[in-house]
């Protein structure tokens, strides 16, 4: 059986760690390969088992980490290596990159060390391809997934939208500051907004919400199913979002997601999720006003199996490619 070493340098509870748990525990994937999760030091990815048949990087890409990536490639010249890009996207680059040339040089240099690069959404893959950051013939798209079966048992929301949930890490990326400002402009006393999550922006968000009793902070959702069950609508005003796992979870739970028009969220709009076209307080206030009071139920509720199958099929296809062609130990040309 194939032995796959998934390297991770951040074990903070979140989407990536839950995704790796899914890969490690899924029985169908387990029939093809033994997926092992290896925690490594930031910028120093060592300790890969000598008998690993394939190495998969879920590591942060940075200039500080590039020498470690080069060393990893040098130590495993005959082993196929894959990088999964969880962090960077077009939306991220637009808001956080001051030197486009330098940033793109970093990505090209890093990705060239790997036999395959996995994007987590079609939108992210399109950005990588358009900018020549990864060779198209080495680029795959595999959406991340977690176990969604518990969400299928949640009853669909009945009646109009009244209880809105914002689920995720409390930081600038998620756009929750803009959401609070927009929500406070909606003059509906029966509408509530509950945040599920923790993060560095908590104090800032509490200050923005002060004086509006409709806005609540519930902390980290130990039981995500309960958070979805207690809501009529989920909102994702993200400034950038390579994929957006919360949208998949909400849809399986029968909830629509009001979302930003960025990155991987665009891939999930066809499931019946309305998009807010502009990243402004005014646009979000208008969207919230229009959706409040409307029927809450998602018209076409996806199954956990359908979303799970897309991820598993992607990995099966990727492993077939890697095991049926010689590993390319030499660097790709950018």
Predicted regions span which residues?
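A short, active-site helix/loop in glycosyltransferases that binds the activated sugar's phosphate group
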Residues: 112-138
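Aromatic "clamp/platform" in nucleotide-sugar-dependent glycosyltransferases that forms part
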Residues: 220, 239
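Conserved acidic donor-binding segment of nucleotide-sugar-dependent glycosyltransferases
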Residues: 259, 271-282, 286-295
């Amino acid at each position: 059986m194939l032995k796959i070493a998934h390297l991770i340098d951040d074990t903070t509870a979140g989407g990536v760690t839950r995704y790796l748990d899914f890969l490690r525990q899924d029985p169908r994937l387990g029939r093809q390969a033994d997926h092992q999760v290896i925690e490594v030091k930031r910028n120093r990815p060592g300790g890969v088992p000598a008998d690993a048949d394939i190495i998969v990087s879920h590591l942060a890409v940075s200039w500080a980490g590039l020498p470690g990536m080069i060393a990893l490639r040098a130590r495993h010249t005959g082993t196929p290596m894959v990088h999964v890009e969880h962090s960077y996207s077009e939306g991220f680059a637009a808001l956080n990159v001051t030197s486009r040339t330098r940033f793109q040089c970093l990505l090209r240099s890093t990705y060239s060390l790997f036999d395959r690069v996995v994007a987590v959404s079609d939108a992210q893959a399109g950005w990588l391809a358009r900018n020549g950051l990864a060779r198209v013939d080495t680029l795959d798209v595999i959406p991340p997934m977690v176990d969604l079966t518990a969400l299928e048992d949640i009853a669909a929301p009945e009646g109009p939208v009244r209880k809105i949930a914002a689920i995720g890490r409390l930081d600038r990326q998620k756009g929750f500051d803009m959401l609070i400002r927009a929500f406070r402009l909606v003059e509906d006393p029966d509408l509530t907004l509950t945040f599920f999550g923790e993060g560095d922006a908590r104090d800032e968000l509490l200050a923005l919400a002060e004086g509006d009793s409709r806005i609540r902070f519930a902390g980290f959702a130990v039981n995500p199913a309960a958070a979805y069950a207690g809501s009529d609508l989920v909102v994702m005003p993200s400034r950038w979002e390579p994929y957006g796992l919360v949208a998949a979870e909400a849809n399986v739970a029968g909830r629509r997601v009001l979302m930003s028009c960025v990155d991987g969220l665009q891939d999930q709009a066809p499931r019946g999720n309305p998009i807010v076209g502009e990243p402004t307080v005014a646009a979000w206030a208008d969207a919230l006003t229009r959706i409040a009071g409307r029927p809450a139920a998602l018209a076409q509720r996806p199954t956990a199996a359908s979303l799970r199958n897309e991820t598993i099929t992607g990995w099966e296809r990727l492993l077939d490619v890697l095991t049926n062609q010689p590993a390319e130990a030499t660097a790709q040309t950018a």
